[in-house]
């Protein structure tokens, strides 16, 4: 097929020469053309299989390399998807940890606020009770000192019933 195309191309190339009125009897163009066509045909006959096998091996090499690159690309894409999935999971886990920490901090804060409030209330109750005791103690001491002063002074005289009433009121 290739040889036929070459012959047709050569004839088309020679057609302008045939159209002119030149005398080509003195030239050896036809012999040279035939020699060239024979040389090209022989060269094609011997080199065609080697050239085809060389080109075929190169195309196989290129396709093999392309397949390797595509496989690497596929692995890279899968790794990327896997890493993105892990990243999303890590973000979700971090958000969960942060929310748990916030909840725990809030719970601890509430616990200490409640404990502090209870401690303050207990301190207030204890201080009120202590103040009441101190007031009673001071009243008792005052009543005792006044009673003692009155008993020691001879100006006032008490009978037993009056002493009992005073002591009852004191307590």
From Swiss-Prot:
Q: Name one GO molecular function term.
A: proton-transporting ATP synthase activity, rotational mechanism
**InterPro entries in the cross-refs:** ATP_synth_B-like_membr_sf (IPR028987), ATP_synth_b/b'su_bac/chlpt (IPR002146)
Membrane-spanning intervals of the chain: 2-22
Instruction: Report how it sits in the membrane.
Output: Single-pass membrane protein
Q: List cellular component terms (GO).
A: plasma membrane; proton-transporting ATP synthase complex
Q: Where in the cell is it found?
A: Cell inner membrane
* One Pfam family hit: ATP-synt_B
Task: Note whether Transport occurs among the keywords.
Answer: yes
Which controlled-vocabulary keywords does the entry list? Answer: ATP synthesis, Cell inner membrane, Cell membrane, CF(0), Hydrogen ion transport, Ion transport, Membrane, Transmembrane, Transmembrane helix, Transport
Q: What is its main location?
A: membrane
Subunit relationships: F-type ATPases have 2 components, F(1) - the catalytic core - and F(0) - the membrane proton channel. F(1) has five subunits: alpha(3), beta(3), gamma(1), delta(1), epsilon(1). F(0) has three main subunits: a(1), b(2) and c(10-14). The alpha and beta chains form an alternating ring which encloses part of the gamma chain. F(1) is attached to F(0) by a central stalk formed by the gamma and epsilon chains, while a peripheral stalk is formed by the delta and b chains.
Q: Which family does it belong to?
A: Belongs to the ATPase B chain family.
What role does this protein play?
F(1)F(0) ATP synthase produces ATP from ADP in the presence of a proton or sodium gradient. F-type ATPases consist of two structural domains, F(1) containing the extramembraneous catalytic core and F(0) containing the membrane proton channel, linked together by a central stalk and a peripheral stalk. During catalysis, ATP synthesis in the catalytic domain of F(1) is coupled via a rotary mechanism of the central stalk subunits to proton translocation.
What's the protein name? ATP synthase subunit b
Which species is listed as the source? Helicobacter pylori (strain Shi470)
Q: What is the organism lineage in this UniProt record?
A: Bacteria, Pseudomonadati, Campylobacterota, Epsilonproteobacteria, Campylobacterales
Q: Which gene encodes it?
A: atpF
């Amino acid at each position: 097929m290739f040889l036929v195309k070459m012959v047709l191309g050569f004839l088309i190339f020679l057609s302008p020469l045939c159209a002119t009125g030149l005398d080509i009897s003195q030239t050896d163009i036809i012999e040279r053309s035939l020699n060239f066509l024979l040389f090209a045909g022989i060269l094609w006959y011997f080199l065609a299989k080697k050239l085809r096998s060389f080109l075929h091996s190169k195309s196989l090499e290129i396709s093999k390399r392309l397949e390797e690159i595509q496989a690497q690309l596929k692995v890279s894409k899968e790794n990327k998807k896997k890493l993105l999935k892990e990243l999303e999971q890590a973000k979700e886990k971090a958000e969960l940890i942060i929310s748990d920490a916030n909840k725990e901090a809030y719970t601890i804060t509430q616990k200490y606020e409640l404990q502090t409030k209870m401690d303050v209330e207990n301190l207030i109750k204890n201080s009120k009770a202590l103040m009441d005791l101190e007031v009673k103690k001071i009243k008792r001491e005052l009543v005792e000192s006044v009673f003692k002063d009155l008993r020691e002074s001879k100006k006032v005289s008490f009978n037993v019933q009056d002493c009992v009433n005073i002591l009852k009121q004191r307590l």
